[in-house]
Each structure stands twice: as structure tokens, then as C-alpha cells.
From Swiss-Prot:
Name this protein carries in UniProt: Protein F11 homolog
Ranges for region Disordered: 1-20
Entry's transmembrane regions: none
Family the UniProt entry places it in: Belongs to the poxviridae F11 protein family.
Regions of compositional bias (Basic and acidic residues) in chain numbering: 1-12
Superkingdom of this protein's organism: Viruses
Biological role stated in the UniProt entry: Stimulates increases in peripheral microtubule dynamics and may increase the motility of the infected cells, contributing to cell-to-cell spread of the virus.
Pfam families referenced in this protein's UniProt entry, alphabetically: Pox_F11 (PF04943)
Signal peptide: none
Length: 451
């Protein structure tokens, strides 16, 4: 047995009937035969010293202890620039470009005849990969070089799901169709290797090849038929993908909403400071005016002092009334509801950003001012003509926006919590990879790229 590989103890047999299961061929020549554990066949010595060869039943999962050399070679062969859109790819490479000695059987009965690199990115799959040649006795090895998320492989009419991990290799007869179900998070990179009988095997075990030819074709034809189990699992993995994508998109949305909330609150905090500054300025101006009058006519001091206090109260009363009416109008206005109706929604997997009609907002608040100023105290029109009008307008809009964003954040969080609960362990096992994808997409939003 190759010291760089070991058979997986928990996952080694599909339980499916195999044509090799019925074929036992005997020879009496032990010369140059190595009795070694391998994933393709088993050699059994009988009491009469004859040797029996029993081909693989179903499929075998083995673990390759060290694939760094293979991974380094593959990385050099992959395209330097990756596509920005999710995709799949299959790249055929020369059979001698990568060291694959860990797939040797010990007797040189099988040689590498074809090598491909498969790439599957988040949200994509590769179904019905067919490597069968009529009458062949080939094996297929699918080695997982990289999987930064969840990747499941199923063989046609074999109910077992193989959740692939780095360094694990699935080996089976070539008459099985290969299905890589929807990739969830990140990407997976596989090395697909076809192993064909060597000349030595064809000479020594020709009867095995002959006896398997018809059975292999029979199984291949069966595997071409629709597989309800695979369709069911394919749909399940797609549903998992959609739920994970929902979490990712809404996580990005939450970060966006939190940023907008912070900015809006900070803006209103600044406006509050400007209100206070304006009050102080008005008070100072009135005091200054009263002092000038008092200097001219000391007798009027008491009367003017009362006038100053009355003016200050009147200005404060006017400002507070205007502010209260503006905010009340903003909170209850159907017009503003329509203006803010585009904040933000998910359409076909993408976030539709804020698209406020600023002119409509301005016109709305102007109408609010004119509608209410007739019932306000004297001085309202002077305030309306000043910069305070714009501050009130923005402040009212922001107060409504803050309430809207907080409600939206709450709804999004509830939806995400429900999805996370449904996913259970799948979410827990992939949480780090999900957070990584969220960070990458947030950076794309910041840089102005599309999701």
C-alpha cells in the first residue's frame, strides 16, 4: 500500500452491485505479483496456490497524506486571471505534468491515461460527467485539491453523498456518471484522473477484461437513466445555496444599513448643535439690541427687559412648534412613504441601493412648511427664509429615515435568524467561510463593484 495514502474507514463502499463482484479469475503464476492493498482490486491466494483477482465493488474513498506537490503544480497550470462571475471550468492537461504516483496499484496494472482540472465556484455545479468508453476497464479518481466551502459528489444510481474535503480522493469504475452538486461558499478544485489497464494487465488478466466488457456496458446504460435520488439531492443543495446566499446578501445589507444609520444619526446630532448655536446667537443679538436701547433711554430698561424675555420665549415657542409639526408631518406623511419606498430591497440576488428623489423630498417639506406656517406664531416666515428651513427639512427626513432603517434592520435580522436555524450544522460548519465572503462583498460595494 502506498504510504502516502490510506483507505477512509468510514466511507469506502457504495453498497451497489458491481460487475467485478461476480468475476474471479485464477492464475498460477505468482512471479512479479505484489499482494498490496489498493483501491482497484484485491488479489486472493487460494489453497491450490492459484491467485484470484476481484475488481473494486462500488467506490472507495482514500486520503492522500501529502498533496502539496500536486497542488503547487496545478496552481501553476490554472489561468492567472479568474473571472469575476461565478463559473465552472474543465481544463485538460498533459498526463505527465503532475506527479500521480500515489495512485499506483503496486503491480503497474493501471496507467494514467487522462487528467483534467475541474473548478466549481459558489452557486454552480457540474453534472453528468461521462468518462466511459465502450468495452473499457477504466477507473476514475477524483482528488479534492481545494474546497473552501461545501461540495458534494454523487455517482449515478448510488445513493451515497460524498461531502468532499481537501486531500480526499474518490475512486470508482468509469461506467459511473459523476455529479458535483451545487458548490456552496467559495470554490472547489478537483483533479479528475482516468486510469486505464496497462499492457501487463491486458496480457495477464485478459479474461477479467473480457468478462467485464458486457457487464460494464450494462451498468453504463443503466446509469444513463434518470436518477430520482440525484435530482432530489441536487434540489436540496440548491436550496441550501439559496439560503446561504440569502444570509450573505442580508449580512452585506445589514452592514450597509448600520453605516447609513450611523451617518444619519451623526448628521442629526450636528444639526442639533446648529440649532443650539442659532438659539444662542438670537438671544445674544436681542440682548445687544436691548442694551443699545437702554443706553439711550435708561427709563425704558424694565420695559425692554420684559420685551427681551417675551421675544426669547416667542422665538423658542415658534421654533419648537415648527420642529414638532415638521417631524409629525414627516412621520405620518404618505408622500414620504412613497419617496422612501425604494430603500433597499433584494431583487434576484442583488441589493438595490437607496434611490431617494431628493427634489421630491425637498418639495414635500416645503409644502409642509407652507401648509403649517399660517397657524404658527409670528416669525415663521422669517425662519422659513433662513438656513434653518433647510436644517428642519433635513432633520425631519433623517428622523423618519432612522425609524425606517431600525425597523428594516430588525426585519432582516429576524429573517436571517430563521434561515440560520433551518440550516443548522451546515451554517455552523461554514460560518467562517460565510463571514469571509461577506467581507469580500462589502469591500466590493465600497470599491463600487457589483455584487
Amino acid at each position: 500500500m502506498d504510504t502516502n495514502r490510506k483507505r477512509s474507514l468510514d466511507e469506502h463502499d457504495t453498497g451497489e452491485e458491481s460487475p467485478g463482484k461476480l468475476q474471479i479469475v485464477e492464475i498460477n503464476d505468482e512471479e512479479d505479483i505484489t499482494f498490496t492493498d489498493n483501491p482497484y482490486y484485491k488479489l486472493v491466494k487460494s489453497r491450490d496456490n492459484s491467485i484470484n483477482l476481484v475488481p473494486l465493488v462500488g467506490c472507495v474513498m482514500i486520503k492522500i497524506n501529502d498533496i502539496k506537490g500536486v497542488t503547487d503544480k496545478v496552481n501553476k497550470l490554472l489561468p492567472k486571471t479568474s473571472s469575476k462571475t461565478n463559473s465552472t471550468s474543465c481544463i485538460n492537461i498533459p498526463i505527465d505534468s503532475i506527479p500521480l504516483n500515489f495512485l499506483d496499484d503496486g503491480n503497474k496494472y493501471f496507467n494514467v491515461s487522462e487528467v483534467s482540472i475541474l473548478q466549481v465556484s459558489h452557486g454552480n455545479d457540474m453534472m453528468n460527467i461521462d468518462k466511459y468508453v465502450d468495452g473499457s476497464f477504466d477507473y476514475i479518481a477524483v482528488l479534492c485539491l481545494k474546497n473552501s466551502g461545501r461540495s458534494v459528489i454523487m455517482l449515478n444510481h448510488c445513493n451515497k453523498q460524498h461531502v468532499m474535503q481537501d486531500n480526499f480522493c474518490l475512486i470508482f469504475r468509469s461506467f459511473y456518471g459523476i455529479n458535483i452538486l451545487t458548490q456552496i461558499i467559495g470554490e472547489s478544485v478537483y483533479l479528475l484522473v482516468k486510469l486505464s489497464p496497462s499492457d501487463l494487465f491486458k496480457i495477464r488478466w485478459s479474461s477479467v477484461i473480457d468478462s467485464n466488457r458486457f457487464m460494464g456496458k450494462k451498468f453504463y446504460i443503466r446509469n444513463l437513466q434518470e436518477d430520482a435520488c440525484i435530482e432530489k439531492m441536487k434540489n436540496m443543495e440548491k436550496d441550501i445555496y439559496k439560503n446561504i446566499e440569502f444570509i450573505i446578501i442580508n449580512s452585506v445589507l445589514l452592514e450597509d444599513l448600520k453605516s447609513r444609520l450611523d451617518i444619519t444619526r451623526e448628521l442629526n446630532h450636528t444639526i442639533d448643535k446648529m440649532f443650539n448655536h442659532n438659539n444662542n446667537t438670537l438671544f445674544s443679538d436681542i440682548i445687544k439690541l436691548s442694551e443699545e436701547i437702554i443706553d439711550k433711554d435708561f427709563k425704558n430698561m424694565e420695559k425692554m427687559s420684559d420685551s427681551v424675555l417675551a421675544d426669547v420665549k416667542q422665538i423658542s415657542k415658534t421654533k419648537n412648534k415648527l420642529r414638532e409639526r415638521l417631524l409629525k408631518a414627516a412621520i405620518s406623511s404618505k408622500e414620504v412613504e412613497e419617496i422612501l419606498s425604494d430603500i433597499p430591497v433584494i431583487e434576484e440576488g442583488t441589493i438595490k441601493q437607496f434611490s431617494l428623489n431628493q427634489r421630491a423630498v425637498y418639495d414635500h417639506y416645503k409644502k409642509v412648511i407652507y401648509k403649517n406656517n399660517s397657524s404658527l406664531d409670528l416669525g415663521c416666515m422669517n425662519i422659513e427664509k433662513s438656513y434653518m428651513f433647510n436644517l428642519y427639512k433635513v432633520y425631519g427626513q433623517n428622523e423618519y429615515m432612522i425609524t425606517y432603517i431600525l425597523n428594516l434592520i430588525n426585519r432582516v435580522k429576524k429573517g436571517m435568524d430563521a434561515i440560520k436555524s433551518n440550516l443548522g450544522d451546515i451554517y455552523k460548519y461554514n460560518i467562517d467561510n460565510i463571514n469571509l465572503v461577506v467581507s469580500e462583498r462589502i469591500n466590493k460595494v465600497i470599491s463600487g463593484e457589483s455584487l
